[in-house]
């Protein structure tokens, strides 16, 4: 992320390798958070402390974080729930880049995990895009299953959804 103050930041998912695998166990969950560290472009390396800034929602397995800034808020978008039919796009925000981040009141910006008959399924990942005329869109991955079956023969496809901001900044 390239902040408007000139600083640059690296975000990544932290994986708990003590865990027995995807989904983990209550004692040692596989997912251990989204971490943030500053990047020094002159030195060409990460510098300073690594900070765990986002635990995700109870849906779990958060990955693919991106940050963008709007009206003094840092918004983090991430994928949750794996890449199958529980896939979802989660949003959180903070006034400071290193958190704390609060989850969107509805948790998910985009998902069809609870709508098994929706024509677009497996929505997740993605990035916010602002057009030159000030409109916002969220690009994301998804799949279109064949009618009556849960097979998406075209695999993961790209989709785009228009975003409308509320008065509360969500």
How should these model regions be labeled?
Residues 1-170:
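Carbohydrate-active catalytic/glycan-binding domains of CAZyme proteins
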């Amino acid at each position: 992320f390239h902040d408007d103050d000139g600083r640059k930041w690296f975000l990544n998912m932290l994986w708990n390798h003590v865990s027995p695998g995807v989904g983990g166990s209550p004692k040692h969950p596989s997912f251990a958070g989204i971490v943030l560290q500053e990047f020094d472009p002159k030195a060409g390396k990460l510098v300073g402390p690594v900070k765990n800034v986002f635990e995700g929602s109870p849906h779990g397995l958060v990955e693919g974080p991106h940050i963008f800034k709007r009206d003094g808020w840092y918004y983090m978008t991430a994928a949750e729930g794996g890449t199958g039919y529980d896939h979802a796009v989660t949003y959180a925000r903070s006034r400071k880049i290193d958190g704390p981040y609060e989850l969107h009141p509805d948790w998910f910006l985009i998902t069809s995990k609870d709508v098994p008959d929706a024509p677009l399924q497996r929505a997740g990942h993605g990035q916010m895009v602002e057009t030159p005329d000030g409109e916002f869109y969220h690009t994301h991955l998804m799949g279109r299953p064949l009618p009556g079956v849960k097979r998406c023969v075209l695999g993961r496809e790209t989709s785009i959804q228009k975003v409308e901001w509320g008065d509360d900044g969500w």
